[in-house]
Every structure is written in C-alpha cells, then in structure tokens.
C-alpha cells in the first residue's frame, strides 16, 4: 500500500505490511531492505512495538505524482458583524504513472481550534474521512495505470474581528 501526506512531502511512500510476522522469528535491530531484487536501504525493525501487522517503508515511488496547490478562486476573507470568516481551498492532484493499479492512503488536515471563539468547518473533502478531534482527513483511493484524480479540500475558519490568525 502507498501512503502520502502532501502537505509535508509530495512523494508517495510504499509501505510493506506483513501479517503473521511473529512466525518468522524476526530479531529487533537494523535490517537490509530489498524490493524487486534491488537493495533500497536499511530500516530499523522494532518488533517489540508492532501489532498483528508489521509495517515498514520501502521508500519513495516517484511514479506516483502528487501535487497540492492552493485554489485562489475559493480562498477569501469576509467580515460579518463582530466576526470574520476566512475560506481556504486546496486541490490535490494524484497521477499513477506505474504500469499497474495502486492503492493509496492520502492524509491531509484541517486546522483544529482549542478556542471556543474560533470555529473550523469542513466544506468539501471529496469523500475523505474526517477525524474531527485531530483534524485529520484520510482518503483511500485506487488509481488505474495512467489515471489522474483530483480531490478538493475546502474549509472555513470563523473568528473574532481584530484577531490575526495564520491559517493554512
């Protein structure tokens, strides 16, 4: 499975997930990692802290192209009474240039307010799943070879007039 958090890094990372790994008698420590008969690096195996599935990264895959761009036509600031509302919009574009289908877990986030005078409202998350307590949005998508998909992330932040917030 592939994972990406384009807000932090635009690359997709291939994640190996091994079930029934307890039967393999793996030792904790440094491991050489091979993928498709090619040495790709070293990883630390922390078997003491694993659950029923052992997960580790096999590195970046540049054949899954991801862009996260701000949509200026949806981004705005409005003043209403004693509050102001700022709308932010992002476009996530994902393209699979691999010769086979890929499954990708994509993560992004909304700001999370700890102040009752500041509210954050998701307006569009393109079918993603939102964890409101953490603000984390998760998309599970499958892309066919050559397929491109665009996802929208739009939210608004309402806060008292006169406050200066940095919202991204």
Give names to the regions the model predicted.
Residues 1-91, 98-116, 124-127, 145-155, ...:
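Intrinsically disordered, low-complexity Ser/Thr/Pro/Gly-rich interaction regions
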Residues 13, 133-135:
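Aromatic sugar-binding surface patches on proteins
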Residues 130:
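Extracellular beta-rich ligand/substrate-recognition surface
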Residues 136-148:
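A surface-exposed beta-strand-loop module
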């Amino acid at each position: 499975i592939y994972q990406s958090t384009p807000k932090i890094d635009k690359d997709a990372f291939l994640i190996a997930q091994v079930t029934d790994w307890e039967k393999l008698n793996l030792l904790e420590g440094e491991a050489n990692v091979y993928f498709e008969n090619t040495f790709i690096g070293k990883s630390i195996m922390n078997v003491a802290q694993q659950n029923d599935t052992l997960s580790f990264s096999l590195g970046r895959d540049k054949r899954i192209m991801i862009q996260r761009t701000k949509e200026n036509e949806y981004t705005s600031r409005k003043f209403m009474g004693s509050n102001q509302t700022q709308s932010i919009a992002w476009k996530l574009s994902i393209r699979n240039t691999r010769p086979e289908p890929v499954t990708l877990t994509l993560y992004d986030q909304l700001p999370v307010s700890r102040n009752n005078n500041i509210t954050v409202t998701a307006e569009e998350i393109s079918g993603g799943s939102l964890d409101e307590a953490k603000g984390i949005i998760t998309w599970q998508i499958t892309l066919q070879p050559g397929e491109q998909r665009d996802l929208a992330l739009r939210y608004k932040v309402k806060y008292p007039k006169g406050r200066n917030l940095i919202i991204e």
